[in-house]
Curated annotation (Swiss-Prot):
The active site is at D208, E245. The lineage of its organism: Eukaryota, Metazoa, Ecdysozoa, Arthropoda, Hexapoda. It is found in: Secreted. This is Alpha-amylase-related protein. Chloride binds at R206, N308, R343. It comes from the Eukaryota. GO terms for cellular component: extracellular region. The modification Pyrrolidone carboxylic acid is found at Q21. It catalyses: Endohydrolysis of (1->4)-alpha-D-glucosidic linkages in polysaccharides containing three or more (1->4)-alpha-linked D-glucose units. Transmembrane segments: none annotated. GO terms for molecular function: alpha-amylase activity; metal ion binding. Belongs to the glycosyl hydrolase 13 family. Binds 1 Ca(2+) ion per subunit. Keywords: Calcium, Carbohydrate metabolism, Chloride, Disulfide bond, Glycosidase, Hydrolase, Metal-binding, Pyrrolidone carboxylic acid, Secreted, Signal.
Amino acid sequence: MFKFASAVILCLVAASSTQAQHNPHWWGNRNTIVHLFEWKWSDIAAECENFLGPQGFAGVQVSPVNENIISPGRPWWERYQPISYKLTTRSGDEQEFGDMVRRCNDVGIRIYVDVLLNHMSGDFDGIALGTAGSETEPSTKSFPGVPYTAQDFHPSCEITDWNDRFQVQQCELVGLKDLDQSSDWVRSKLIEFLDHLIELGVAGFRVDAAKHMAADDLSYIYSSLSDLNIEHGFPHNARPFIFQEVIDHGHETVSRDEYNQLGAVTEFRFSEEIGNAFRGNNALKWLQSWGTGWGFLPSGQALTFVDNHDNQRDMGAVLNYKSPKQYKMATAFHLAYPYGISRVMSSFAFDDHDTAPPQDEQEKIISPEFDEEGGCVNGWICEHRWRQIYAMVGFKNAVRDTEISDWWDNGDNQISFCRGNKGFLAVNNNLYDLSQELQTCLPAGVYCDVISGSLVDGSCTGKSVTVDNNGYGYIHIGSDEFDGALALHVDAKI
C-alpha cells in the first residue's frame, strides 16, 4: 500500500511539473511574445526598456545563445550549428546576455532562449572555428569545447523517409551531427547548459527540432532542470516555460501529441491556415470556429504565430512582411481571437533563404536604427514596431480573460466580433467596402481605432467610432484603405 501511495504521489508531482512547463510567467495582463530574430543582446536590453515594456509586450524569444560555427557570408542559419555551450555569439557574450536578461526582467519582459538540444554542427572541411574561439572537427564528431566525441552521437545516417521514426529521431537532420539524448553524459551537458541559462534569469526555452528527439528523453531533461531564479522575480518552485518546435501537418509518424504534455508546441497548422485565409484562398467567414475547431491543439498548449524565421522564407501560403496589408490583417486577427500563446515576428529584410542579418564590413551585426515614427531602417523590418501590430498587443492585453461573442460576417471575407464588453475587431478582405452598423459590445462613447491611429492626449490620430447606448457603431473599412482592419477597446476610449 505504501509503495502504491508513493507511486501515485510521484505521478502527481510529475504531472504538476509538466503542467507548470506551459506557464510563460508573464507580468500582469501582458500576453504576447516577440521574436527579435538575430538582434544583439545590448539592443534587446534597450528595446525592452524603451519600447517593449511601455507597449505591453510580455516576452522576447532570442536567437541561440551558445557558440556556433563561423560560416562564409555569415548566414542566419549558422546560429543553428552549435559547437559548444559557451555563451558567445554574434549577439554578444555571456556578460552582455546576463545584463540583457536582468534589464528585461526588471521591466516585465521575460526572455525565452531558442535552444539546440538535438544536434551539433554539420560537416566542415577540416578544422572549424567558432564564435567563442573554439576549434572543432565536425566531420569526426569532435567538439572539444563541450567536450563531445563520436560516442556521444547517433551513428551517421540520412533522413530519406519522414515516416520512419528511427530515421526522424536518430539520423542527421540536414547533415547536422545528431546527439544521443539517452546518453548520461549528453543529458548532463544539456541540463548543465539549460540550468546555467536559468541561473542567469531566463523564463524558458524554445526547443528547436524537438520532434527529432524522443519525447521520453526530453521529459527526463526537462524534469531535471532547476526551478526558475527567484532573484529575477519568479515565484518559488516556478518551472521554465517550454515550447517545442514540432512540425506536424496531421499525417506525421512523429506526432505533436507526443510532446504537448511536456510543454507547449509550435502550432504550424495555425500559420499555414491563417496564411491561406488572408491570402484569399479560404473565406474569412470560416474563421468563426478558429482554434480547436480546425484541429489545432488546445489553446494553452499551442504556441501560435503568423510566420516564423524558417517558414517566412519558404514559398507557399505563409504570410510575411512582404505582403504587408494581408500580414497586418492576419496579425490583428491572431491577437484579437482568444486562442493560443501568441508570438509575433520581428524580421530583417531578406532576398533569399540564406541572407545574413544586417552587418558591417567586418561581418558584425549592426544595431537597428529608427525613423521619426519609430519604425526600423538599415535592413531591419521590425514588424513589432508597426503601429498596427503593437497596437494589437495592447488590444490583447485590454481584452484578456474575455470570450468571443457577436460574430458577424457577410458570408465571405468581411467579419467582426466582440471580446466581451472590452474589445471589438472588424476585418475587410473583400475588394469592396465594408460599411455596416455592427454590434461592438462596448459601453456607449467614442473610441479610437487603434489600427489607423493612436490615442494621443485625449485625441485620436486615426479613425474614430461612436458607439450608441445599445453597443452599435457604424463601421467603415474601404477596400482601398491602407489597412484592412479596425480595432476598438476600452483603453482607447476618447
